[in-house]
Amino acid sequence: MFQDAAFPDAKEQVRQSTDIVDLIGKHLELRRAGRGYVGRCPWHDDRKPSLQVNPDRQTWKCWVCDIGGDVFSFVMKREGCDFREALNMLADRAGI
């Protein structure tokens, strides 16, 4: 677990070490669509892919649920955890 003084640096280090396409692709089937990726949102009955992943911005968004964000918000939504727990999960995943 990160100390409060190291928290901002740890957050940025984890963000830079985690590719959003790789992270989301471990949980959802993504397919290339132009410069980004699309997949079926796990939070609603999604018949057509409405979740978009932008590798350039390192963000995701579901246009039906109107939710999205970065690697931290994806883990928080998927795991039902708070930011600090998501930070620690992603740090472990990145070997930080």
What spans do the regions from the language model cover?
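N-terminal structured subdomain of primase-like DNA metabolism proteins
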Residues: M1-I96
